[in-house]
Amino acid sequence: RTAGHKVGAETFRNIATYCQELGIQYLTIYAFSTENWKRPKDEVDTLMTLLEQYLQEAIDTMERDHIRLRVLGDTTALSPRLQQMVAETNAISTHYQGFQANICINYGGRAEILRAARLCAESGEAWTEENFASHLYSAGMPDPDLIIRPSGEVRLSNFLLWQCAYSEFYFCDTLWPDFERRDLDKAIISYQSRDRRFGGVKG
């Protein structure tokens, strides 16, 4: 699986570039969940090394290419080096507009909701959807229009549970390391054929 993770990182670069070309504003990838710590240590170590390499490359190119890259998740469990790199990429991103790529690291949808509820309660704010959402890792971003689940799995795996309330879903058998631009095209075509009513009725 280690080789697959390395190819998967390249897939992310390719798909992110393609999203920019298509005019898509946000791309969020689930890189490492809160449950992934249960995997074999060598696999976890490989994933962390890949994340360090990717973030370092991003830091080296973000200012040149005006790219926004944000890390979503509980970063306190990461190594000090990774935490520093996350802080740097998030800081650089505040200077630019346009396409934004998000990487979910040590992220879990349930944990995110619990964290937001705690912060909302501590703030003393009124319990509204807007105030609650302001304490999510994705604060300031729109909810996803489309969630793509590759690899033949038909479940959310604790991903963006609050944000996906009215998202469209697309499931495909293609493994993430094999996911290509044509696979994204198929997902977008499927999405464009949907009738999104957001709980209302068709006019």
Name these PLM-found stretches.
Residues 1-203:
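Flexible, compositionally biased loop and terminal segments
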